[in-house]
Amino acid sequence: MKLEKGLIHVYTGEGKGKTSAALGLAMRAVGRGLNVLVQQYFKLESEPSGELAWKEGLKGHPALEGGEAGHLIFRRGDYRHPFFDKNADRAAIRAKILEQTALVAAEMKAGYWDVVILDEFNNALRDKFVDLEELEALIDASPEEVELVFTGRGAPVELIEVADYVTELHAVKHPGTRKIAARKGIEF
């Protein structure tokens, strides 16, 4: 299955659930035969995560063997955001982000992906690791039938204006304010 027309989604805001919302879309897309790339920025290859464990657990699952299921690939950089790593080399991080983004653009042009999720890309824009011209080039590189999904805090107005779907998540209540630590299987 291929999409006739891909649209642009933005999940942003200070609330929890931006990546989770995008992964829900990914599950639905794969189940309907679409090929999905989840490109995760600011996340270490070695860092354990529930979404990667979930993907590994699906290998060989009868529902995904044959039939109409698509493919789901997770790809991460191997760097942290300077907020979490005060010794991070901003220039090196920017170079890695641009390298990853160029690969995504090339793969989209080659027809590998029906849905591309750029997880935490909004943060890269907000914090000037990627500029608006580079964002525009990425969107322009996307074939018309590819669905693009941008997640992360601080989506710029320019991205919001070109998006077809924009969801801003707000934390109304969160256990972190009561000093309850992030829990395995729920927050990560």
Residue positions per predicted region:
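Positively charged, low-complexity intrinsically disordered leader regions
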Residues: M1-L3
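Conserved P-loop
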Residues: G6-A106
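Phosphate-binding/switch region of NTP-binding enzymes
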Residues: R153-F188
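Phosphate-binding/switch loop-helix module in NTP-utilizing enzymes
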Residues: F83-E147
